[in-house]
Amino acid sequence: KGIDFDNDLTKVAKMYMVMIDDGHTGIWTSNALIPLGELTKNTRGTIMEEGADIIMTNPPFGSKGKVKDQNILSEYDFGFAWKKDKDTGEFEKGKLLAGKKGGGQVPDILFIERCLSLLKKGGRIGIVLPDGDLTNQNTEFVRAWLKDKAQIVAVGSLPQETFRPFGAGIK
């Protein structure tokens, strides 16, 4: 099962499923980051009722820009600014990132949260992310959030050439 924003890619995925005799249902064209209630009833029901044992994803990143839609950002913890308390070292949730010049959130960060929300308890995620999501100082809140919500079992690196045309280093 899967969701992709690109209609051509969903057609290719459905055709591939037919070729390997796996049917052609369970692939939908949609923005996977929109609030789950806005997905079609068929898509929403399948995803929300069953959950996923395994999620494999390569969310958009690199030069794709930020998500600035308040409707989308408000659905996510990562749609808000996070500030580290100097005394406690804990992160505090601040204002919605939309509306400010340069505001918004990169989609790969939002996809981390979306994937965890769709996963069954005990499920696993394989996700391709830019190096900085797990290493940059300005994404420390992401690591803190992940530490609280999930267990990172492994981080691997791919050769720099893998995504060079897209302008991003990856993990």
Q: Which sequence ranges carry the predicted segments?
A:
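Conserved S-adenosyl-L-methionine
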Residues: K1-T57, G62-K66, P130-G132, F141-V142, ...
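Intrinsically disordered, low-complexity regions
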Residues: I3, E38, F80, K100-G103, ...
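Phenylalanine-focused residue identity feature
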Residues: F5, Y16, F61, F78-F80, ...
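A short acidic, often aromatic-flanked loop/helix-cap motif at beta-alpha or helix-coil junctions
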Residues: L33-P35, T162-P165
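Mobile active-site "lid"/loop adjacent to the S-adenosyl-L-methionine
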Residues: F61-L110
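Flexible, glycine-/basic-rich loop-and-beta segments that form/coincide
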Residues: K66, Q70, R164-K171
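Conserved Class I SAM-dependent methyltransferase catalytic core
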Residues: F91-F163, I170
